[in-house]
């Protein structure tokens, strides 16, 4: 696919943002802070987040406020980048970000329904994105039950996948959160794959297919690893039932062999030795044991420095910016609990 000249601005801006990312030495400084106020002050004065935190008073900011402001800043960066998208590619950028925001909000509501605290939804939902979302946050904030959630989602692509998880057992009314999450994420990737197929071709299509296929395969690797580790008696078929639909079919015989392994470590070694994902080395497969953030870090680093495609650079930036916020949140929480700086550093994913 020929890249429109205006979209070159997306690639240029993303690479500039990536070049200003928080680096290891700055994370080390953050880990030595003692309070949320000190962390906020350092972020405001010494990192690329100066503009995002321009109106923040570090002395009085709470941890939840800081996190919300960082997410708003990330969203504003998305809005700035998508201005340069062409009419043909805008659907991809929108769906990649906003559909995921919608799914995260729905999952948040399901968690609150399960614990009987739905009134807390309105306190934390991202009002800054409300006008861009297709699901009504006002309607969603009034939900008290799963049936009401389904009613609020009537007419969206999320309704039918969630309908199968409606629980009519009054003695045990808990909703299957893991099942809902899998159904919604399958819906997300199915929609995104269709958009990629009709929007891109050539190198852009190939790189996006590669990055998404690798991401899902590694995410499924995490699911298998954790279930093998914490539920060793689960059958391979039961474990596969919790996995996402693959973007690109992996070597199923290898996966089946790994799932029959006796331990989580044997499972991981089988995937490493059998070349579970083409082009991914042993050290990268090891990221399966480290979680989703390590995978996003791996993919961001792997593609950002070599791609010339605006859409791919955009995906890498969204991976990285989310990972950066997660790192900051982890530091704030760890500092609150008085953890040693060296221990905090081990919790972070750093490129």
Predicted regions and their residues:
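N-terminal domain-start signal
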Residues: 1-351
């Amino acid at each position: 696919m020929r890249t429109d000249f205006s979209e070159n601005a997306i690639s240029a801006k993303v690479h500039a943002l990536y070049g200003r990312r928080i680096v290891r030495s700055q994370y080390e400084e953050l880990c030595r802070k003692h309070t949320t106020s000190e962390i906020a002050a350092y972020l405001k004065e010494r990192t690329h987040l100066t503009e995002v935190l321009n109106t923040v008073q570090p002395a009085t900011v709470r941890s939840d406020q800081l996190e919300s402001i960082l997410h708003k800043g990330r969203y504003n960066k998305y809005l700035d980048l998508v201005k340069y998208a062409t009419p043909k590619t805008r659907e991809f950028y929108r769906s990649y970000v906003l559909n995921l925001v919608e799914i995260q909000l729905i999952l948040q509501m399901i968690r609150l329904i399960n614990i009987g605290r739905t009134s807390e939804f309105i306190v934390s939902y991202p009002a800054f994105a409300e006008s861009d979302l297709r699901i009504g946050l006002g309607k969603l904030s009034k939900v008290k039950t799963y049936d009401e959630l389904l009613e609020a989602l009537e007419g969206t692509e999320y309704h039918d996948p969630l309908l199968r998880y409606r629980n009519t057992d009054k003695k045990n009314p808990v909703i299957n959160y893991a099942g809902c999450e899998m159904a919604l994420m399958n819906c997300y990737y199915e929609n995104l794959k269709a958009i990629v197929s009709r929007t891109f071709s050539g190198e852009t299509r190939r790189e996006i297919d590669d990055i998404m296929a690798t991401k899902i395969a590694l995410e499924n690797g995490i699911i298998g690893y954790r279930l093998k580790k914490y539920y060793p008696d689960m059958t391979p078929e039961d474990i596969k039932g919790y996995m996402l639909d693959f973007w690109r079919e992996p070597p199923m015989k290898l996966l089946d062999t790994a799932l029959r392994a006796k331990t989580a470590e044997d499972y991981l070694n089988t995937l490493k030795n059998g070349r579970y994902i083409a082009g991914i080395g042993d050290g990268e497969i090891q990221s399966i044991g480290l979680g989703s953030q390590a995978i996003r870090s791996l993919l961001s680093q792997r593609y950002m420095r070599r791609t010339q495609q605006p859409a791919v650079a955009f995906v890498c930036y969204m991976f990285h910016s989310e990972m950066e916020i997660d790192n900051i949140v982890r530091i704030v929480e760890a500092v609150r609990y008085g953890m040693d700086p060296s221990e905090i550093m081990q919790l972070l994913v750093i490129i």
